[in-house]
Design a protein with these regions (language model features):
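Bacterial N-terminal signal peptides that target proteins for export
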Residues: 1-7
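Bacterial N-terminal signal peptides
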Residues: 7-17
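Short, low-complexity N-terminal intrinsically disordered segments enriched in polar/charged residues
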Residues: 20-72, 76
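Outer-membrane beta-barrel domain signature
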Residues: 138-140
């Protein structure tokens, strides 16, 4: 309940600002203030770090590097991932599923983000949205896939990790 109240307050006070150093389609949600404080600067740094985690997730997928991909997830039995209609409880179960489904790397496709949005809810809790398209250049008959991934990230020590993920997609 407390997180919902924080998210509601944040969404009412947000403005969206492009970060020039981000390079892609990063939308940063921040509380509007008249001046920049040390807390604002810290929030910007943390938001950029979270963005980098989400970009790493996409990059590792495109590199067909499942170990690198899994490094962005919280290595815990409490990790929760819902991909389309399947639910995976725990890091090991998600990893095993990826290994089984991605035996042929050409079936993984190439993912491109169309939007990455990061909202820092608390100093150690964030929400992210990644809108993406996937192509299969090795398979001329495959459809393009369009999807959205939402993630909750927590900061453990100094590292941001995905603790909850939901992905939905459709073929075009």
């Amino acid at each position: 309940m407390q997180y919902r109240a924080i998210a509601t307050c944040v969404s009412l006070l947000l403005f969206y600002q492009q970060l020039p150093a981000a390079g892609e389609n990063l939308i940063v949600s921040q509380i509007a203030t008249a001046s920049t404080t040390p807390a604002d600067a810290t929030a910007k740094v943390e938001t950029q770090r979270i963005y980098e985690v989400l970009v790493k997730m996409l990059d590792r997928w495109n590199a067909r590097d499942l170990d690198g991909l899994m490094s962005v997830y919280w290595k815990s039995p409490s990790l929760l991932a819902v991909i389309d209609t399947e639910q995976f409880d725990g890091w090991e179960n998600l990893y095993r599923s990826y290994k089984n489904q991605c035996r042929n790397p050409t079936n993984m496709g190439i993912v491109n983000s169309t939007r990455v949005q990061v909202t820092l809810l608390k100093p150690d809790l964030a929400f992210g949205i990644v809108c993406w398209t996937m192509r299969y250049p090795e398979n001329a008959h495959a459809s393009e896939v369009v999807g959205t991934t939402t993630v909750d990230l927590e900061k453990f020590d100094s590292e941001w990790k995905i603790v909850v993920l939901h992905t939905s997609f459709t073929e075009m």
